[in-house]
Every structure is written in C-alpha cells, then in structure tokens.
Amino acid sequence: MAKQYDVLFRLLLIGDSGVGKTCLLCRFTDNEFHSSHISTIGVDFKMKTIEVDGIKVRIQIWDTAGQERYQTITKQYYRRAQGIFLVYDISSERSYQHIMKWVSDVDEYAPEGVQKILIGNKADEEQKRQVGREQGQQLAKEYGMDFYETSACTNLNIKESFTRLTELVLQAHRKELEGLRMRASNELALAELEEEEGKPEGPANSSKTCWC
C-alpha cells in the first residue's frame, strides 16, 4: 500500500479573537467559508496533505483561541510547532498592535528556529481597512517574516501562504529531508508526531469537531 504522506508536522494559527483564524483554516482544508463562526474554545485542529517539491506533507494545523482566558491552555501547543501564522485583521488596528505581544509569546514558548509568517486577514474588507499593507510589510520585515494579506472570503493568498510556510519548514529541516530522499521506504515525522498523539494535553476543547 502506497504511503499516504512522507513527512508530518504541525502549523499553528495565533492572533486575537475574531481575526479570522478559523475561517483561514476552513478555507484551506475544506475550501469552505462561513461568515460567522462560534469562537474557538481552547484549541481545534484540522489535517491536510499537500505536495511540495515532490514530498507529500501531512500538516496538522492548530487553531488557537485568542481570548486571554485560554492563553495558559494554548501556549502549551507552541512548543511542538514547526511553523506559526501570526494573524491580524486589516480592519482592526488593535489586532495589528497586538502582534508584538504574540511575537513575544512565540519567542518565549515556541522552539528555536520555528518558522513564522505574518498574515493580514480580511483583505476583502477594504472599505473598513485600518491597517495599511505597507504597515504589515514593515512589521514583517522588522521580525524577519514573510507577509501575506489574505481573505478567506475570496480565497486570496490562502493556498499561497500555507504552501509557503510548509516550504519554509521543509527548508529548515533540510537534513531530515535529505535523509528521507535517500531512504524513500522510511517515513519521517518531522514533528515526531503521530496523528493519534494530537489529542489536546489538557482540558482544552472546542465547539467544533476536534479530539477532546
């Protein structure tokens, strides 16, 4: 039986509540968009397999609650992430200003060398824009991150941003990747993570489908 994937790792979506993290996740994994979602409680996740440079990559994508009361629960997931999206809403200056706080959390709790991309979401809401594209580009430059403006509503840059973060993680794990290519019969889990081990490590749960 052919392998379903070659490598397996985790991506994390973080940012203020209401910036559209769940919408980004659903658009990428299921190609669905719903204008309203119940706020994530704790942590939720979805899986998707994509191919990058001939490598089948199984991605476990975690959607974290942005509310302060869930921060103790969600921060435990930073430690095993290989890639992180830091998301703000272009129609919310407040969510943009809070990116500095989220970066600080990543620096404190995520592993060294974790790959990061800055996302300015809800790009379809141009008439409500409070954060200029140039502001996002400048902030990303300051932190050494790639930057995308996205829209889950119109599907703008959804595939592109997720594919790019996947590429960055693969590049960061080049040695393991070369080992995979030399031993094509062996499966390599970059996150040392089996799917059944993805169960939340605490009382986290979600109003949406998840292991809890």
From Swiss-Prot:
User: Keyword Cell membrane on this protein?
Assistant: yes
Which keywords appear in this protein's UniProt record, sorted alphabetically?
Cell membrane, GTP-binding, Hydrolase, Lipoprotein, Magnesium, Membrane, Metal-binding, Methylation, Nucleotide-binding, Prenylation, Protein transport, Transport
Supply the PROSITE patterns for this chain.
RAB (PS51419)
GO CC list: cilium; cytoplasm; endosome membrane; extracellular exosome; perinuclear region of cytoplasm; plasma membrane
Q: Which SUPFAM superfamilies match?
A: P-loop containing nucleoside triphosphate hydrolases
Q: What is this protein called?
A: Ras-related protein Rab-15
- Which residue numbers does the motif Switch 2 cover? 63-80
Q: Where is this region: Disordered?
A: 193-212
Summarizing the function annotation, the protein's role is:
The small GTPases Rab are key regulators of intracellular membrane trafficking, from the formation of transport vesicles to their fusion with membranes. Rabs cycle between an inactive GDP-bound form and an active GTP-bound form that is able to recruit to membranes different sets of downstream effectors directly responsible for vesicle formation, movement, tethering and fusion. RAB15 may act in concert with RAB3A in regulating aspects of synaptic vesicle membrane flow within the nerve terminal.
**Might you name a Gene Ontology BP term for this protein?**
receptor-mediated endocytosis
Q: Which gene encodes it?
A: RAB15
Taxonomy of origin reads:
Eukaryota, Metazoa, Chordata, Craniata, Vertebrata
Q: Which family does it belong to?
A: Belongs to the small GTPase superfamily. Rab family.
What's the top EC group for this one? Answer: hydrolase
Task: Supply the domain comment.
Answer: Switch 1, switch 2 and the interswitch regions are characteristic of Rab GTPases and mediate the interactions with Rab downstream effectors. The switch regions undergo conformational changes upon nucleotide binding which drives interaction with specific sets of effector proteins, with most effectors only binding to GTP-bound Rab.
Residues binding Mg(2+): 22, 40, 63
Its quaternary organisation is: The GTP bound form of RAB15 interacts with REP15. Interacts (GTP-bound form) with MICAL1, MICAL3, MICALCL, EHBP1 and EHBP1L1.
The catalysed reaction is: GTP + H2O = GDP + phosphate + H(+)
| Annotated GTP binding sites | 17-23, 35, 39-40, 66, 121-122, 124, 151-152
Q: EC number(s) of the enzyme?
A: 3.6.5.2
Pfam families reported for this sequence: Ras
What the record says about activity regulation is: Regulated by guanine nucleotide exchange factors (GEFs) which promote the exchange of bound GDP for free GTP. Regulated by GTPase activating proteins (GAPs) which increase the GTP hydrolysis activity. Inhibited by GDP dissociation inhibitors (GDIs).
